[in-house]
Amino acid sequence: MGNACGGSLRSKYLSFKQTASQRHDTDDNNNAAAADSPKKPSRPPAAAKTDDHPVSASAPAAAMRRGQAPADLGSVLGHPTPNLRDLYAMGRKLGQGQFGTTYLCTELSTGVDYACKSISKRKLITKEDIEDVRREIQIMHHLSGHKNVVAIKGAYEDQLYVHIVMELCAGGELFDRIIQRGHYSERKAAELTRIIVGVVEACHSLGVMHRDLKPENFLLANKDDDLSLKAIDFGLSVFFKPGQTFTDVVGSPYYVAPEVLLKHYGPEADVWTAGVILYILLSGVPPFWAETQQGIFDAVLKGFIDFDSDPWPVISESAKDLITKMLNPRPKERLTAHEVLCHPWIRDHGVAPDRPLDPAVLSRIKQFSAMNKLKKMALRVIAESLSEEEIAGLKEMFQTMDADNSGAITYDELKEGLRKYGSTLKDTEIRDLMDAADIDNSGTIDYIEFIAATLHLNKLEREEHLVAAFSYFDKDGSGYITVDELQQACKEHNMPDAFLDDVINEADQDNDGRIDYGEFVAMMTKGNMGVGRRTMRNSLNISMRDAPGAL
């Protein structure tokens, strides 16, 4: 697209540039290498503001003004716990997850650092939500002692939050470690896969199904020790009995097993997901890929595995045999975790060759990890750049849903508002919308969050908004985005700027070292931006697209 359409699209961009509004005060959550933290920054994140800290003292009225929990919320853990601040000194924010924020904390009695995931009780809307948190803590304790599972230190509860203190994984994300090594071989991939599948086997032997295995849920406790790989985030994990089947669709699109999409699955789904991770470790790309989320699901159900494209012609037959058996679309014929560990390719001192993989594989892994960051930053820029005229319809919709005129939409208001607009979403799907839109984990959706969420659904591909986002990154107005300009934007958003060269290289189709407008549009409209816990965006889009006042 950079060659064929770049000129005309760049002209459109330049013609729009003078009228494209933009703001530079958008905010982002710092990411760090710790439990519940998706990425490691290139530099330490700034210390969290005291006013934003979940364990800072604040009056109930102030908490309510911020949309936090009222002081009289019932107990989640079901028993009294010590005061977290009596035991730990709280530090900087490490990461922002979908259901909680992770902070660095230091045990006062020992000086040992830990990670503390703080979950807002306002997000625990139903009895099921409360049970989910209890179960996550129970499962972490149940798996305690496994060397490759993050260790839980304790769980605490106050008026506003549930806090889970756990082992600090300061060594970074799995993919980041692979990239840093430089030399990367099938044998190294086999070692890493052996650890990952070992965790799966341990979970299954203890009656636990993880249900959300993915590379970002494996972190290193020590950056110098590959064997310190730890599985984190058991928020979607469940206990199961032999023969028991599950029907709720959870997980992430690239990694979800076909039987999960068909709503009839068991622990075999974890083995499928581990097979997807192995495919990515060896090639740098997911095995089931499409331009849309629905396309990804269709590819998963079709089950075709590409072993013809590079680098697969030089990958060993034994590796491909293992992947084929892990990605068997028939769960009962799929290898168990124990059988995977017995496969010749993966066994210690097995047949996996030690010759280096094509460097392009490392590059693909970097791109796969980095691209979504830029898209999400651009999405926030677009949301902040909308004119008052353009968001009038969405503003009206927001005001209609905000029944008490508080400036924030609660779960009940969202549910009732969507019903008025003809939505047939289930309660769990509405809860998913809350999770996706509630950026600051306040338990409510404020005006900017609402605009960003609805923009994500039905306005991303509007050209004038793409122009506004491009204009934000194109600091000098040259019509091109450079690495330096992306670094500046990342600094403004407090985002890590590692691997921006790879973002440029993937989007730069005419190889001139920069991104023109046509290439930017291609990047923004290609593929899937990532969905968290469950998928409901398409049905919501249908409901809202025809609603009164929808844009």
From Swiss-Prot:
Binding site for Ca(2+) 4: D508, D510, D512, R514, E519
Subcellular compartments: Membrane
Residue numbers spanned by region Autoinhibitory domain: 352-382
Catalytic activity: L-seryl-[protein] + ATP = O-phospho-L-seryl-[protein] + ADP + H(+); L-threonyl-[protein] + ATP = O-phospho-L-threonyl-[protein] + ADP + H(+)
Residues annotated for Ca(2+) 3 binding in this entry: D474, D476, S478, Y480, E485
Residues involved in Ca(2+) 1 binding: D402, D404, S406, E413
Positions of the EF-hand domain: 389-424, 425-460, 461-496, 497-530
Domain notes: There are 3 contiguous domains conserved in the CDPK subfamily: a kinase domain, an autoinhibitory (junction) domain and a calmodulin-like domain. The autoinhibitory domain (352-382) inactivates kinase activity under calcium-free conditions.
Function recorded in the entry: May play a role in signal transduction pathways that involve calcium as a second messenger. May function in signal transduction pathways that positively regulate responses to cold, salt and drought stresses.
Protein name: Calcium-dependent protein kinase 13
Organism of this sequence: Oryza sativa subsp. japonica
Gene this protein is translated from: CPK13
